[in-house]
Structure formats: structure tokens, C-alpha cells
């Protein structure tokens, strides 16, 4: 029923109402259905007496009809009549009133409430209203809209009370069937009988609490669909309090829990089917009558609705402007990934089980028979374990290191692609696990279910009904989650893309209004449902795997990341269910005390957990960084000893490196990557013409002073005279940071005559600017420090295409690799060689364009950094 937000403050004048034509009035006090009909102190109108008589007449069925099976059929027929009158009769009237104001127009057209109208119908209706509202009520002083609503209320009273009474008739007659089956302990174990009665009574009491709490909140105005006829002033929004904060549309959802409680008590599948049918019709009524009217009155304005649609469309840009595949939903024949997913799902859910069933009993391996059932089970478990580990590990790496995002940026691929491709991987893995689980059960079905292996095999129809209900619940919950957080949230988008201002807070709309993590339980209830239908050991193990992985992923992967991005206050905000339980079960004084004291420990506990993980990660990163930089941190003396240069102090052979730079006496001399290195040598007159000098990494040669045991890989030159010089450049250089040395070798062999002083090759450090306005200066620095040393021919200007110069190099691909590596090392922004020759597909990439791309990449990575996220949270 349409729900109004704020309870009006009780004043002597009562709440104010306004008709859709603009007339204002004071809304008089009215009574609820139960008090009106059954309270003897309240005066009854003629129509109310007729309603009571009709309700009592249902008892004639027990007196006039002697056969219980006939009674059941009569009551089912009566219930169907009143249920259809409710959902389609009242539904039709409300639809006409909501869209065309038909009921009010009919009253105006017939002058029903006109004092001069003395027709029988007019007099009866006015008499009914006077009896209902009391002698002080003046019909002419109130709008036709309000008086029409009062008449409509009596129609509702008749239909709703008759609907419930005939349903109780179905319950009683079915419970009486088969020698009082609902209490008969000879037909069922006593503990089961008592359990049924207790659980059923609990559901009925819960249903009663829902109805009473709902009525206390929304009053008669919304209970009788008052907002179809007029509006109460200052009630522009929907209410979310009490039971409305715990469940979506409680009058239509959990408000029918009592129906299933009656079915349990009656021990009747007939009652269960009738309850399901009635509940189903009620959901249709909600969807086609109630929700459209709620959206019209309380929903967003036209501009707001358009904005929401535009936001959803914009979100699709992360998925190539198409709705991504979820399971097999949004399937498109034009997407290769969708076709592959369909083939995979069909293969594992149908083809493999069908093939496996055909070789049961005949399959052998090395003469031994293979248990195909065990193989199918092992396959399902292996797939689920693989999916769990791969997705969890991947999300952790993405959360802390942005592994996937950096990989895409390094190849000049838009970061939106990282999310769209992740969505394909994620959906494929999830679909694979569900297909294998369905396939396992399909295999057992076509090979013949061994019911003896079930933990319980009674109540087949009940188990099937509850199992199907759980499966449908998971489908509905998943759909509701996507409606609330979109495909961006469904595929963990905030692990991959920077949060925008529109996503600076966690949503509390839709299903998230009632539960903080609806997927924690309901996200795998479909697996529970299938396990309930076929309760075998294999299914229980699979169900445990699904539930455990779901719990771990939400609490130790997703929640940790959410705290990092949105903050603990957002993540640990009470859900609607929690708020209502606190309000109902904990006194206000204690609740306030707990809320003030409880948040700090919670904060500390979760903070310590997240900080522990972050601390371990930071320590590991620091250790690796120090390890990589350890050569640069060695003292000059240690390096000399490490390279064993001191052993050749008095040698007749000598190598001098001419163009090294010096920064500190304690540190070795250095040059930058790509800079040509000039050496001079001297040796005795009688040296061999086959003497040669090679360039090596110190860490690879330190264990051998007298002989070099590794190849120079082309980084060498002949010594043709007693004195001379040579410039190592291009492919004869190392293109990575490290500590190096030159070695003088004798007679074309690897015996060492001299080892030069060690020196360092460093990458030039280039600071990437924060804004595009500094891109030209940045480009000039890139050209001078990176491109000029690497390319054989210097690039003419920063606006010249890079490819024109690189293509003139002797080693095209190697030059691209060197450029990419040096740019990555110098700027701290990792790119690949593909970045350089793919980036200029439409326009040839220049150094200036490259500098702009690097600035943009830096901005994206900074937006994804913990510091930026913390700054956004503070704002």
C-alpha cells in the first residue's frame, strides 16, 4: 500500500489534506478495519453489518456441507473469488483513479454527495458515511475526493475481510482432513508435529507484528490507499521506518509469512499452493498498480529520472556502451565473449554430464574402473577452488597494487578496458562454477538419483518448493543489487577506476537500504536451494565451498577495500534491519549508551585489521625496493673490493673510463642509460693482436678474478694497439641500471689481465608534471634525456613523429623496447613498447603527445592511490 513518509503531529485540528484539484481541508479521524468491524463500542453502519453477516455466513459451509472434501473445494472457490476481486477488482478501481480520477469523476457526475440529490443510492451512501464518521460529520464541508475515499474504504473492508476469512476456511478444512492430520501423531513423528505448530505459530505472530507495526506507521491514510484520492500536506516522501526499514514493501513481501505458517500448521500442500497463488497475485498487484502510483507521486522528478538514466548510460562506457553479460543475462550474439560463455556453460552443464553418463561402468584407466561420479564431483570442486583463489588473489593484487590497471596503462589502453575485460573474466569464472555445479546434479539425475545417499529424502514437494524459492530469491537479489549499484558496482568497478563525485558514498538505496551486504547470504542461496532439493554429500560440500568463499570475499577482500575507498563510517553504517532490531529489542537509554561506546571498538578493530594488511604490504614493498637498489647504496670502497679492481694496481695493463660523472666521494662514478661510454687503454708492446675488452655486470663476474666465465653478449672490442680508445654505444651498452666494469682479456680467450674501476649506469630522473600546461617542458626533457641517447638519429623536434626517426634505426623493435624501458625507469610510469607504436594509429605519436599521455596516466594512478582516496574522504 502506498506509504507516506512523515507521521503528522497530532493537533486538535488534525492533519491537513489537499485534493489533486487543489482544495485543502482538515482530515478527520478514522478507524482501522478491525476496530470498525469488531469493536462493540464503535457504532456499526448498515454496510458494516452486512459485511459481518457475510463473514459469519461462511460458517454455514460447515453446517450445510457434511463432506470435508467438498468443503475444501467450496472454500477454495470462495477464496479465489475474493482474491481475484482484491487484485483485479480493487486493482482496476485504483488504476482508474490513479490515472484518470475515475472514481471521483463518477461521484461528481452522479452528484452522489449533493444535498439536493435524494436518490436511493445517494441517500444510502450519505447515510453510510454519516454512520461511519458520526453525527458531527458534515458531508458537504469535505471534498468529494475525501468522501469518495470513505465509500471506497467499505468496499475494501468487504473484499479484504472476506478474502482472509475464506482463506482461514481453507486452512481449517484442510487441517481437519484425514482424521485431523495437523495434530495426528500416528501420521507423523510427535517432534515434527510440535515443530510444525511452533514454527507455523511463529510465522503467524511475525506476520501479525508486521501488519500492526505497518499500520502504526502509515495509519489509515496509506492502509486504504488514501494517496490515490488526496495528499496529506508535508507527506511528499516515502517513509522508511520500523518494518518499512527492514523489508522492501513489507505488506506484500513478509506480510504474507503468516499464510505459510498456516500451511505448516495445517500440514497441507493444498494450503501451501493456495498461499503461493494468493501471494503471487499480490506481487502482480504491487508491480502493476502500486509501484507505478508510488513512482508517480514519490519518485524522482522528470529531470531527476532523466539524470539517473543518463548516469546509467554513462556507466556503460566502461563496458563498450553495451550492457555486460551477467550469467547469461544481456546475452548478445554479436559479442564473441558471450558466445564463448554460452558454449562453456552448455558444455559443463549439459554436454559433459551427458557424455559422462554414457560411459558409467565402462570407463577404465590402465585396467582399473573409473568412478565417473567421483570424477564429476572432483571436477566441480576443482573449478570452484580455482575460481575462488584466482578472483580473490586478483582482487587483492588489484586493490593494493592496481596490477591490472597499470598493465593497461602501460600499453596505452584506456583504463575502462581494464574493467570491461575484467567483467568478462569474472563473469566467465562465475558462470563456469555454476555450470559445473548444475552439471554435477544433472549427471546424477540422468544416471538415476540414489535417494539412499540423501541425508533426508522425505517431504519432496516441500523441499522442491523451498529450493525453487531460494533459487528465485538469489535471482531477485542479484537483479536488485544491479539495480542499486549498477554494473560498475557488480563487477567491483571501484577496484579499477577512480571514484567520481557521484560515487563518493556507498549507496543506501534499493536492497541496500535494508541490508548492508545482501549478497553475503542471499548471493549463494540458489546453491543452498539446489542442495535442499538434492541433499547429497557432494552438494553439501559444494554448498560449503560456495558459502565459505562468499563470506571470505565479502569480509576480507571487498570490505577491506571498501574501508580504504569510502571509510569505515560508510561501510559500518547500520542497515535498516539492524536499526529496527536495536529499536525493538534494546531500550532507548541503553541503545544510546551502546551506540556512543560501541563505535570506537568497532573502528579500532577494523582499523587494526586493515592497517595490519597495509603494513605488511608496505613493508614487503620497501624490502623489495631496497633490495633492488642495494647496489647503488654500496660504498665506493666496497664496490672496488667487490669488483676486484684492487688486485690489478701494479698491472702493465690498464683501462680508463673517460666520460663518467662524479656525485660523491663515497659513491661510484656514474653515467646515464644510453650515454656513450668512452674508454682508453694501454698495454705492453708484446701484447697479442687478439686481446679484447668487454663490458660486464659486477654482480655476474665478482666470483671470478682471473677468468671471465660468462659471455659478453656482443659488448666488446679488439685491442689493436698498445694505446688507444673506443666508444661503447648502442647495442654495446647495457640499457638497465646497475654496477658495471670493463675487463681486459688476453689472446682471444677469457683470462683477465685487468679489471676497471666499477661504475654505475643510472636512469635520468624526470619528474612528471601535474598539469598539461607543463607538457612542453616535460617533452623537451624527455627528448634530451631519453630519445636522443637511444635513437641513432636525433628526433628533430618534440612535434615530430617518433616513428619517423625510430624506423631509421638499425634495430627497430629493440629501439622501441629501449625507449619504453627508459621512459618507465626515468618517470616511474610503466609503459610497454606497444604503447609507443600503437599510440599513433590515427595520428603519428610525437614526444609532445607522449608527454601529455604520461601526465594523464600519472593523474589516473594518483586518483587510485590511497592518499588521494583519503583526501576525497576528508572532503
Swiss-Prot record:
Main location: endoplasmic reticulum
TM spans (from-to): 45-65, 74-94, 155-175, 190-210, 246-266, 271-291, 340-360, 377-397, 423-443, 465-485, 527-547
PANTHER family, alphabetized: PHOSPHATIDYLETHANOLAMINE N-METHYLTRANSFERASE (PTHR32138:SF0)
Membrane-topology annotation of the record: Multi-pass membrane protein
HAMAP family from the UniProt entry: PEMT
Keywords for the protein's UniProt record, in alphabetical order: Endoplasmic reticulum, Lipid biosynthesis, Lipid metabolism, Membrane, Methyltransferase, Phospholipid biosynthesis, Phospholipid metabolism, S-adenosyl-L-methionine, Transferase, Transmembrane, Transmembrane helix
A molecular function (GO) term: phosphatidylethanolamine N-methyltransferase activity
Catalysed reactions, as listed in the record: a 1,2-diacyl-sn-glycero-3-phosphoethanolamine + S-adenosyl-L-methionine = a 1,2-diacyl-sn-glycero-3-phospho-N-methylethanolamine + S-adenosyl-L-homocysteine + H(+)
Domain of life: Eukaryota
Membrane side Cytoplasmic: residue ranges: 66-73, 176-189, 267-270, 361-376, 444-464, 548-875
Lumenal side: 1-44, 95-154, 211-245, 292-339, 398-422, 486-526
A Pfam family reported for this protein in Swiss-Prot or TrEMBL: PEMT
Record bears the keyword Transferase: yes
Protein's UniProt name: Phosphatidylethanolamine N-methyltransferase
Cellular component annotations (GO), alphabetically ordered: endoplasmic reticulum membrane
Species annotation: Meyerozyma guilliermondii (strain ATCC 6260 / CBS 566 / DSM 6381 / JCM 1539 / NBRC 10279 / NRRL Y-324) (Yeast)
The family this protein is said to belong to: Belongs to the class VI-like SAM-binding methyltransferase superfamily. CHO2 family.
Encoding gene per record: CHO2
Pathway the protein takes part in: Phospholipid metabolism; phosphatidylcholine biosynthesis
Amino acid at each position: 500500500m502506498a506509504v507516506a513518509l512523515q507521521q503528522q503531529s497530532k493537533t486538535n485540528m488534525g492533519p491537513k489534506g489537499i485534493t489533486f484539484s487543489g482544495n485543502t481541508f482538515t482530515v478527520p479521524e478514522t478507524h482501522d478495519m478491525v476496530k470498525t468491524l469488531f469493536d462493540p463500542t464503535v457504532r456499526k453502519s448498515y454496510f458494516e453489518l452486512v459485511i459481518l453477516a457475510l463473514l459469519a455466513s461462511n460458517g454455514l459451509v460447515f453446517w450445510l456441507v457434511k463432506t470435508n472434501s467438498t468443503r475444501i473445494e467450496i472454500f477454495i472457490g470462495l477464496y479465489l473469488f475474493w482474491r481475484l476481486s482484491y487484485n483485479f477488482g480493487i486493482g482496476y478501481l485504483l488504476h482508474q483513479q490513479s490515472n484518470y480520477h475515475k472514481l471521483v469523476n463518477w461521484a461528481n457526475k452522479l452528484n452522489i454527495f449533493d444535498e439536493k440529490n435524494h436518490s436511493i443510492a445517494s441517500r444510502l451512501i450519505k447515510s453510510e458515511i454519516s454512520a461511519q464518521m458520526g453525527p458531527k460529520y458534515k458531508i458537504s464541508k469535505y471534498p468529494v475526493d475525501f468522501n469518495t475515499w470513505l465509500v471506497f474504504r467499505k468496499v475494501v473492508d468487504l473484499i479484504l475481510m472476506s478474502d482472509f476469512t475464506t482463506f482461514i476456511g481453507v486452512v481449517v478444512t484442510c487441517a481437519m482432513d484425514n482424521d485431523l492430520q495437523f495434530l495426528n501423531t500416528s501420521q507423523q513423528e510427535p517432534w515434527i508435529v510440535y515443530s510444525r505448530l511452533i514454527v507455523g505459530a511463529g510465522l503467524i505472530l511475525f506476520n501479525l507484528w508486521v501488519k500492526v507495526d505497518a499500520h502504526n506507521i502509515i495509519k489509515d491514510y496509506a492502509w486504504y490507499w488514501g494517496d490515490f484520492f488526496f495528499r496529506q500536506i508535508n507527506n511528499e516522501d516515502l517513509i522508511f521506518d520500523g518494518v518499512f526499514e527492514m523489508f522492501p514493501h513489507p505488506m506484500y513481501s513478509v506480510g504474507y509469512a503468516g499464510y505459510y505458517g498456516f500451511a505448516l500448521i495445517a500440514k497441507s500442500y493444498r494450503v501451501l499452493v493456495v498461499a503461493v497463488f494468493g501471494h503471487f497475485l499480490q506481487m502482480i498487484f504491487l508491480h502493476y498498480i502500486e509501484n507505478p502510483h508510488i513512482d508517480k507521486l514519490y519518485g524522482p522528478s522528470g529531470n531527476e529520472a532523466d539524470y539517473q538514466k543518463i548516469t546509467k548510460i554513462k556507466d556503460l562506457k566502461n563496458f563498450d556502451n553495451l550492457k555486460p553479460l551477467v550469467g547469461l543475462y544481456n546475452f548478445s550474439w554479436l559479442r564473441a565473449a558471450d558466445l564463448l560463455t554460452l558454449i562453456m556453460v552448455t558444455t559443463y552443464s549439459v554436454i559433459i554430464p551427458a557424455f559422462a553418463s554414457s560411459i558409467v561402468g565402462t570407463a577404465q584407466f590402465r585396467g582399473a574402473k573409473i568412478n565417473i561420479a567421483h570424477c564429476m564431483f572432483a571436477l566441480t570442486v576443482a573449478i570452484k577452488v580455482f575460481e575462488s583463489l584466482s578472483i580473490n588473489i586478483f582482487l587483492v593484487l588489484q586493490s593494493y597494487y592496481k596490477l591490472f590497471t597499470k598493465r593497461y596503462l602501460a600499453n596505452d589502453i584506456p583504463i575502462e578496458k581494464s574493467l570491461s575485460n575484467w567483467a568478462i573474466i569474472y563473469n566467465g569464472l562465475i558462470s563456469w562454477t555454476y555450470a559445473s555445479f548444475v552439471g554435477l546434479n544433472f549427471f546424477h539425475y540422468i544416471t538415476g538419483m540414489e535417494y539412499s545417499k540423501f541425508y533426508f529424502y522425505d517431504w519432496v514437494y516441500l523441499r522442491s518448493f523451498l529450493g525453487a524459492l531460494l533459487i528465485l530469491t538469489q535471482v531477485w537479489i542479484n537483479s536488485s543489487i544491479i539495480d542499486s549499484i549498477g554494473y560498475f558496482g557488480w563487477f567491483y568497478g571501484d577496484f579499477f577506476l577512480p571514484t567520481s563525485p557521484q560515487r563518493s558514498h556507498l549507496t543506501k538505496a534499493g536492497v541496500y537500504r535494508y541490508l548492508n551486504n545482501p549478497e553475503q547470504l542471499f548471493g549463494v542461496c540458489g546453491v543452498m536451494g539446489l542442495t535442499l532439493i538434492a541433499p547429497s554429500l557432494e552438494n553439501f560440500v559444494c554448498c560449503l565451498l560456495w558459502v565459505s568463499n562468499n563470506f571470505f570475499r565479502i569480509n576480507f577482500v571487498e570490505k577491506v577495500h571498501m574501508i580504504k575507498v569510502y571509510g569505515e563510517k560508510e561501510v559500518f553504517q547500520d542497515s535498516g534491519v539492524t536499526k529496527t532490531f536495536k529499536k525493538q529489542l534494546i531500550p532507548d537509554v541503553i541503545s544510546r549508551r551502546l551506540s556512543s561506546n560501541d563505535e570506537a571498538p568497532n573502528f579500532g578493530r577494523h582499523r587494526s585489521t586493515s592497517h595490519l594488511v597495509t603494513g605488511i604490504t608496505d613493508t614487503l614493498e620497501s624490502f623489495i625496493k631496497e633490495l633492488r637498489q642495494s647496489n647503488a647504496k654500496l660504498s665506493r670502497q666496497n664496490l672496488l673490493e667487490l669488483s676486484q679492481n684492487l688486485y690489478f694496481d701494479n698491472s702493465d695493463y690498464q683501462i680508463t673510463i673517460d666520460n663518467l660523472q662524479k656525485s660523491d666521494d663515497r659513491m661510484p662514478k656514474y653515467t646515464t642509460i644510453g650515454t656513450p661510454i668512452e674508454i682508453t687503454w694501454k698495454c705492453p708492446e708484446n701484447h697479442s693482436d687478439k686481446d679484447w675488452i668487454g663490458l660486464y655486470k659486477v654482480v655476474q663476474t665478482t666470483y671470478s678474478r682471473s677468468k671471465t666465465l660468462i659471455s659478453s653478449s656482443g659488448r666488446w672490442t679488439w685491442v689493436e694497439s698498445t694505446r688507444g680508445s673506443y666508444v661503447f654505444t648502442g647495442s654495446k651498452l647495457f640499457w638497465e641500471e646497475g654496477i658495471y666494469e670493463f675487463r681486459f682479456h688476453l689472446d682471444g680467450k677469457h683470462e683477465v689481465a685487468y679489471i676497471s674501476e666499477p661504475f654505475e649506469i643510472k636512469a635520468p630522473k624526470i619528474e612528471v608534471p601535474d598539469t598539461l600546461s607543463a607538457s612542453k617542458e616535460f617533452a623537451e626533457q624527455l627528448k634530451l634525456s631519453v630519445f636522443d641517447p637511444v635513437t641513432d638519429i636525433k628526433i628533430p623536434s618534440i612535434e615530430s613523429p617518433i616513428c619517423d626517426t625510430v624506423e631509421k634505426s638499425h634495430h627497430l623493435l629493440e629501439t622501441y623496447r629501449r625507449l619504453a624501458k627508459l621512459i618507465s625507469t626515468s618517470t616511474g610510469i610503466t609503459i610497454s613498447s606497444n604503447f609507443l607504436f600503437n599510440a599513433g594509429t590515427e595520428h603519428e605519436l610525437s614526444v609532445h603527445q607522449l608527454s601529455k599521455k604520461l601526465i594523464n596516466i600519472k593523474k589516473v594512478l594518483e586518483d587510485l592511490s590511497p592518499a588521494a582516496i583519503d583526501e576525497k574522504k576528508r572532503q
